[in-house]
Design a protein with these regions (language model features):
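ATP-binding/phosphotransfer module of carbohydrate and carboxylate kinases, centering on a glycine-rich
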Residues: 1-11, 24-25, 47-51, 70-75, ...
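Phosphate-binding/catalytic loop of phosphoryl-transfer enzymes
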Residues: 9-124, 128
C-alpha cells in the first residue's frame, strides 16, 4: 500500500523478528516461539518487494527505535529495552551503538536458566526465564486463556494472580539486575 501512495520514495524495509538473527545475512537462525530455523527472511522479502531488507532481532530494533525516536537520548548513552511478550528479550545499546555480541545473541535473556530443573522450555532447556516470567508463562500458570483475564483478576485482588505476577517479577527483576551488572 505504501509503495502505491508514493509519499516519499521507499528505500528499503526494516523487519524486527523475535529470536536469534544473523543480521549480516538476513537470516532468522532460530525463533523458537515461531518455529523458524535458518529462515532467509531478508532474501524472501527482497524477492517479493524488490527492495533491500534489513532483518534485526525485535528487541534490538525496539532499542534503536527508542534511542532515535523515544526521547532526548545522548549520543553516547547506554540503554536497554526489554520486551516481555511470548518470549523475553532485550535490546542493548552501549555508547549509543547497538551491541549484538558474537553471533547476534546479546540480549536473548529469555533463555537464561533461572530455575534449576524447572519447566521444559521451547528451546529445549529447563527453567528458562521465559518459562516463569513471559506473558505466555503467566497466562499458563493462571490456567487462563488471555493476559487480559489475568490482568482483570489481578486488579480485583486475586491472591493467586498476585503470587504468579510477583514470582514472574522477581525472576525478571533478578535477570535484569544481572544484565545491567555485566
Amino acid at each position: 500500500q505504501l509503495t502505491r501512495k508514493k509519499l516519499k520514495p521507499i528505500v528499503g524495509i526494516g523487519v524486527g523478528t523475535p529470536g536469534l538473527v544473523n543480521t549480516r545475512e538476513g537470516v532468522v537462525v532460530n525463533a523458537v516461539n515461531l518455529e523458524w530455523q535458518n529462515l532467509p527472511l531478508s532474501q524472501l522479502l527482497e524477492k517479493k518487494y524488490k527492495l533491500p531488507v534489513l532483518v534485526l532481532n525485535d528487541s534490538q530494533a525496539a532499542a534503536i527505535g527508542e534511542f532515535v525516536y523515544g526521547g532526548d537520548h545522548l549520543p553516547d548513552e547506554n540503554l536497554i529495552v526489554v520486551n516481555v511478550i511470548h518470549g523475553i528479550g532485550a535490546g542493548i545499546l552501549i555508547n549509543g551503538q547497538l551491541f549484538q555480541g558474537d553471533g547476534g545473541g546479546a540480549g536473548e535473556i529469555g533463555h537464561v536458566v533461572v530455575l534449576e530443573n524447572g519447566e521444559l522450555c521451547r528451546c529445549g532447556k529447563r527453567g528458562c526465564l521465559e518459562t516463569v516470567a513471559s506473558v505466555r508463562a503467566v497466562v499458563k500458570q493462571m490456567k487462563m486463556d488471555s493476559l487480559d483475564n489475568v490482568i482483570s483478576v489481578f486488579q480485583n485482588g486475586d491472591s493467586k494472580a498476585k503470587s504468579v505476577v510477583d514470582r514472574a517479577g522477581r525472576y525478571l527483576g533478578t535477570s535484569l539486575a544481572n544484565l545491567v551488572g555485566t
